A protein has these predicted regions:
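The feature captures the beta-strand-to-loop junction immediately N-terminal to the Walker
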Residues: 33-35
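Helix-to-loop junction immediately C-terminal to a conserved catalytic motif
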Residues: 48
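ABC ATPase NBD coupling module
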Residues: 65-79, 103, 109
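Short coil-to-helix segment of the ABC ATPase nucleotide-binding domain corresponding to the Q-loop/switch region
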Residues: 91-99
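Conserved ABC ATPase "signature" region
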Residues: 109-128
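Conserved ABC ATPase signature
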Residues: 132-136, 140
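Hydrophobic anchor residue at the start of the ABC signature
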Residues: 146
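ABC ATPase C-loop
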Residues: 150, 156-157
């Protein structure tokens, strides 16, 4: 599902990743461990298409990834759950979780609400759909972030310290 060949990234003079090679097949799990500043989150950001490597090749499901995800017409479905839940403060919990579904014009508002409610219940959250993120604890916000990653059938899910501050 994921293959890297000589993947490198530099921030100015600093090499963050140097010639990273790995292959992750469908159904396999990979733990990326290392000290702070070793490039763990950078690897996940590259996989999610948020940044591009300086050198090397990344393939997801056999397709070479040359563009940032937002620049692609039909990008691979990669979900990223960050240490910080990255919720939009002006949106309700339902809007934060369901924004991916709103792109699908075939789904009714009622169905979107039901799907969001089901995903929230999967992570142990109930009756929070109309709340704003700042009305929830940090652990609850983390659960919302997980619910957002569950919202549709994702093909690849990457997590950076997802259980930190999880209640």
């Amino acid at each position: 599902a994921v293959e890297t060949k000589n993947l490198s990234i530099s921030w100015g003079e600093v090499n963050v990743l140097d010639q990273l090679n790995f292959e992750l097949n469908e159904g396999e799990k990979l733990a990326i461990v290392g000290p702070s500043g070793s490039g763990k989150s950078t690897i996940l950001k590259i996989l999610a298409g948020l940044i591009l490597p300086t050198e090397g090749e990344l393939k997801i499901f056999g397709e070479k990834q040359n563009y940032l995800r937002l620049d692609q017409n039909n990008p691979p479905d990669v979900r990223l759950v960050f240490q910080n839940p990255a919720l939009l403060g002006s949106l309700t919990i339902e809007e934060n979780v369901g924004f991916l579904l709103k792109r699908n014009k075939n789904l009714s508002k009622k169905l979107i609400h039901e799907i969001v409610r089901d995903c929230l219940s999967e992570v142990g959250l109930f009756n929070v759909e109309n709340k704003l993120p700042n009305e929830l604890s940090g652990g609850m916000q983390k659960r919302v972030s997980f619910a957002r990653a569950l919202i549709t059938d994702q093909t690849l899910s990457a997590k950076t310290k997802p259980l930190l501050l999880f209640d």
